[in-house]
């Protein structure tokens, strides 16, 4: 059924100092579809992604997934983020004192997996990206591209239904950026997830099924 964004608006401030950052945003994303959000700085992209991830409340409107408000699927938004949504950020944000394997198993156990289940899932994911030999390595022992690949697999650890990526290649060179986005797309397609990524890099547009342009808080095209 996919994800339906319905009339999402977001206003910051009060009374005379109000600023409307998002204005009646409407679009849909099908299961297995990978879209890119694009627009100038200040167009509302990150605000929208933050609302979709349950990190910020909208002023009005709703986000519907499988016929039900996304924000009512769990008792609180923390459970939503842990179980249904995988986040990938500009920086990998790996925990410096945790080994690669533990970066993933920690997330799995927080979602209710047993240690055995979490280890098996983590090893499966890390093998997919060719890091099975680095399970006991620390983040500083990996390249920037390897760290971001671990961050992607961490986002997929709990079988999320929705993957949200905010400029995940901003700190990578062109070849690494393409490799990372191709990996994100491949996982979204293979697992029929919903993928939404923000990027300014037009060379990455070819990986998207569709580009959604934002301009001044509104959808310019979808």
UniProtKB/Swiss-Prot annotation:
SMART domains: AAA. Keywords: ATP-binding, Cell membrane, Membrane, Nucleotide-binding, Translocase, Transport. It holds the Pfam family ABC_tran. One of its GO terms (cellular component) is plasma membrane. It is a peripheral membrane protein. Its EC number is 7.6.2.-. Residues 3-222 form the ABC transporter domain. GO terms for molecular function: ATP binding; ATP hydrolysis activity; transmembrane transporter activity. The complex is composed of two ATP-binding proteins (HrtA), two transmembrane proteins (HrtB) and a solute-binding protein. This is Putative hemin import ATP-binding protein HrtA. It comes from Staphylococcus epidermidis (strain ATCC 12228 / FDA PCI 1200). The gene is hrtA.
């Amino acid at each position: 059924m996919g994800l339906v964004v319905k009339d999402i608006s977001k206003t910051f401030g009060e009374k005379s100092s109000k600023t409307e950052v998002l204005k009646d945003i409407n679009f849909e994303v099908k299961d297995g579809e990978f879209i890119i959000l694009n627009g100038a700085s200040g167009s509302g992209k990150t605000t929208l992604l933050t609302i979709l991830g349950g990190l910020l409340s909208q002023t009005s409107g709703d986000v519907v997934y499988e016929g039900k408000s996304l924000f009512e699927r769990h008792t609180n938004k923390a459970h939503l983020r842990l179980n249904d949504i995988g986040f990938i950020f500009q920086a990998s944000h790996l925990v410096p004192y945790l080994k690669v394997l533990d970066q993933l198993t920690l997330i799995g156990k927080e979602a209710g997996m047993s240690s055995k289940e979490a280890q098996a899932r983590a090893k499966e994911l890390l093998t997919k990206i060719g890091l099975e030999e680095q399970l006991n390595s620390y983040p500083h022992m990996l390249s920037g591209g390897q760290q971001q690949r671990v961050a992607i697999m961490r986002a997929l650890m709990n079988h999320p239904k929705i993957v949200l990526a905010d400029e995940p290649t901003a700190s990578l060179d062109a070849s690494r950026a393409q490799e990372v986005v191709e990996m994100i797309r491949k996982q979204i397609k293979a697992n029929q997830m919903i993928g939404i990524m923000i990027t300014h890099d037009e060379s990455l547009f070819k990986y998207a099924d569709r580009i959604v342009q934002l301009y001044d808080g509104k959808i310019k095209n979808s």
